[in-house]
Regions:
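Bacterial N-terminal signal peptides that target proteins for export
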Residues: 1-9
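Domain-level marker for long, solvent-exposed, non-transmembrane regions
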Residues: 21-193
Length: 193
């Protein structure tokens, strides 16, 4: 009994460190990626500040917003490796801050819709090519049937402004949406499922 327990403990003490050692290179690689994203986001935030961009009072700092956006761009699902978020940015000018913000937001949404349509179409074309059915690509409805209302879980993640020489507000907005759900909804609309 004692020998069995001793053998079990010996195996466990050898097996657990081996697992930890096997995961160690992954942690180093992840940390290197994390450090690179941090470095790039600090550089980009510095460029925005030097260009005169500011955030509204009571908003998160530019550094933190840029950092969050960069990590969202790199975020993937643990099992499938699929992206988690769609990211889109746009800039607009107006004499009113709210109108400039609204224009930039709508433009970013429209860009995101076109991005998703392109992703879905390219994926469908690639699947048809790999199956040897190039001339039998499925019919895709007119792009006008897909609107920004089909985007799922849209959230602004970066919002900053600057004043131009004419006294107009120039607003930069970056939004994110759920990748899988948005692609699923727009795919259903495009193929009219």
């Amino acid at each position: 009994m004692c020998l069995r327990f001793f053998t079990w403990c010996l195996v466990c003490f050898m097996f657990v460190p081996a697992l930890a050692w096997a995961q160690h290179p992954n942690n180093k690689a992840e940390q290197a990626i994390r450090n690179e994203i941090e470095r790039q986001s600090r550089r980009e935030a510095g460029q925005l500040k030097r260009a005169g961009w500011k955030v509204m009072p009571n908003k998160t700092s530019i550094e933190q917003q840029v950092r969050d956006v960069r990590f969202m761009e790199a975020a993937t699902h643990a099992q499938s490796g699929e992206r988690l978020y769609l990211i889109s940015s746009s800039c607009a000018s107006d004499s009113s801050y709210l109108m400039a913000r609204r224009k930039a937001d709508m433009s970013a949404r429209d860009k995101m819709v076109q991005q998703v349509i392109s992703l879905i179409y390219n994926s469908g074309a690639e699947n048809a090519r790999s199956n040897g059915e190039l001339e039998q690509l499925p019919f895709i409805a007119e792009n006008g049937t897909v609107t920004s209302a089909h985007l799922q879980y849209v959230v602004p993640v970066l919002e900053c402004y600057r004043m131009d020489r004419d006294g107009c507000y120039e607003v930069l907005v970056t939004i994110r949406a759920d990748y899988a759900r948005t692609c699923q909804v727009i795919n259903a609309v495009l193929y009219q499922k």
